């Protein structure tokens, strides 16, 4: 009985110790999981309060990490402390900013703001073991600032366009649209003032370590949410031209840059032309035309084309780059005298002579009969013609008239036949139009010319000629 009572007393004492330990643990304000949740909510509340006031300072002081790049969408985080409205995938890399480190001793992954901007309210309640971590976290801010290097992440922008939309991440999408709308209004106002003053949007001087402040450079920095830093070699100029923004899609912008070709032989290279091309969000196909002016000299290397924008479109981006046409200058046509000629008319002396087809000469029509009399060199086709010509030199007249009482002689037979017609009165050459007859063929030919010319004359001249023919016989009769 005594042993049983002792065992009951020991069991009751063990139960009391367990209850006291549970009461002590229950008296603690929060456990580790609840403490990490409170820290995450407190960090989000601090971010929403100090985000807008320290926006520019945050952009300047945030370091570059390989986890995420510094595009303009990194700075547009949700401004509400409610953790239930933000999905978990929007707070994990590559969606979370690069310098938001997870706090130690917490099982929940939550972005922590940079300690240089604010101090959390739970620093006094944290154990002393976390203090060295905070001191190490503050130490990188005292180091010299790293040079700016900014790029474009295809993975981030593609995932943002597909995952973080109004349904999945409404707070982030609303803040992005609101901030980009304000930046677009400032950009259009600055572009209008720049076009009025005929000042380029940005001028990059590669030889200076820090660009001097100017109105054009300040306007370019205010226009974009995140400035673009290009590594431009020496002796090059960057000229930005902004096209007319599309009224339907003021959110998305893009920069079209054509880099210059490599210059050889001391020739200054072509300028780098950047043009702002608006991209509509609803179109599945985006076509971009790269304007290029004909260079004075043919380029040796084809110039590459770079496409950059705030967000990569979902559709296909096509680059239509015109090929440079090299026109060989033609030398001006100069005549042998030294005068310039028009390229329309052919130059005299330079036109190729057309191959003329020479007709084959008949061997019977060659003037092979040459007169051998000194001082004469006439040629004839026939030997009979040469004999008749030689008679003119010798004076020989073998053909004599047989008419009674006529003793005339002739060197040629045709002359004798013509002379005989004068005795007989024969006129064997008749005109087919007026029936007039002639003794000689040459007389008929001369008469036929009158008929041909009469057809061309007007009627009044024909009448005058007829009157003259009528008036001539009385005059001749009176003269006789």
UniProtKB/Swiss-Prot annotation:
- Organism's domain of life? Eukaryota
Enumerate the SUPFAM superfamilies for this protein. beta-beta-alpha zinc fingers
Instruction: Return the annotated region ranges for Disordered.
Output: 1-32, 64-83, 97-146, 202-222
Fetch the InterPro entries from UniProt.
Answer: Znf_C2H2_sf, Znf_C2H2_type
Q: What cystine linkages occur within this chain?
A: none
Q: Which GO terms describe its cellular component?
A: nucleus
Listed GO biological process terms: bone mineralization; cellular response to endothelin; cellular response to starvation; circadian rhythm; negative regulation of DNA-templated transcription; positive regulation of osteoclast differentiation; positive regulation of transcription by RNA polymerase II; regulation of circadian rhythm
Assign the protein's first listed, main location to one coarse class: nucleus
- Where is this protein localized, as stated in its record? Nucleus
Induction conditions: Up-regulated in response to glucose.
Question: What's the family?
Answer: Belongs to the Sp1 C2H2-type zinc-finger protein family.
Full protein name: Krueppel-like factor 10
Q: Which organism is it from?
A: Rattus norvegicus
Q: What is the lineage of its organism?
A: Eukaryota, Metazoa, Chordata, Craniata, Vertebrata
